[in-house]
Amino acid sequence: MVIILLLLLLSFLDPSLEESLAPRLTRTPRAPCARGQACDPRQRRDAGGRGGVYEHLGGAPRRRKLYCATKYHLQIHPNGKIDGSLEENNPLSILEITAVDVGVVAIKGLFSGRYLAMNEKGRLYASEVFNRECEFLERIHELGYNTYASRHHATTQPPPTGSGIGGSKRRASSKRQWYVSINGKGRPRRGFKTRSTDKASLFLPRVLANKDHEMVRKLRESQRHHTGSHRAPVGRAERRRRRHRGSKGHNRRADI
C-alpha cells in the first residue's frame, strides 16, 4: 500500500518538476558564426543601425548648435566658409550631427547643406559632398564640453630615442590631434595650432530653441513647395499631350 502511494505521489510530482526545469534546460539557439569571423553571442545591428550592441549608430541625426567656450556658435555657410556667430538664433548655426562609426561623427549645416571638413593643411571648410575629411572624432571633455578632432589628419611627432641595456630603443611615434577650433574673434584656427585643452576647441552641444524649431519648420515647408512647383508643369504638359492625342484619334474616327 505504501509503495502504491509513493508511485502516485511521484506521478503527480513529475509534470511539475519537468515544467520547472524546462526553462533551465532549454537554451537559446545561437546564430552560426561565419568562417574567419569572431563569434559574438550578442545581437548584431542590421543595415539600418537598429538593435544590437551598436544601436547608437546609423540612427537619425542629432540637431544641435555647437556653442564654443569662446561664446561663438559654429556656423557653416553655403559658400564654403566656416566661422562663429554671436547670434542666438542664426539659421546657419543649426547643425545635424550623425554618427558614422564608433566615436566618429559627421557635422552638416541644415540650412547650407554642406559638411564641416578639415583638409591636410588644417583649414576648416564646408564641403558640398561627404568625404573622408568630413569625419571627426567626438570626445567628451572633463569639463562637460565636447571636442571634435579630424579623423585622418594629425601631426606625427618624431619618436624619442632612449638608451637601453642592449643599445638605443625607439618608441612608437605618437600623433597630436587637430581639433575644430573657433578663436575669440569668431575665426577658425588651423588644426596644427590647436590643443584639446584650448578654450577655442571646447564645444557644448545645445538643443534647439523654439525659434530654431520654427526656422526648421519653415525650411521644410519651403523645400516641399519648391519640389511641388517643379513637378506641377510636368503634370500639365502631360495632360496637354494626352488631350492632343485624344483629339487626333477622335478626328480620325470622324473622317472614317
From Swiss-Prot:
Keyword Transferase part of the UniProt annotation: no
Biased composition (Basic residues): 238-256
InterPro entries found in the cross-reference section: Fibroblast_GF_fam, IL1/FGF
Keywords annotated in UniProt: Developmental protein, Differentiation, Growth factor, Mitogen, Secreted, Signal
Biological process according to GO: adenohypophysis development; anterior/posterior pattern specification; cartilage development; cell fate specification; cell population proliferation; dorsal/ventral pattern formation; ectodermal placode development; embryonic neurocranium morphogenesis
Region (Disordered): 31-54, 151-176, 219-256
SUPFAM superfamilies for this protein: Cytokine
A Gene Ontology molecular function term of the record: fibroblast growth factor receptor binding
Similarity remark: Belongs to the heparin-binding growth factors family.
Protein name: Fibroblast growth factor 3
Taxonomy of the source species: Eukaryota, Metazoa, Chordata, Craniata, Vertebrata
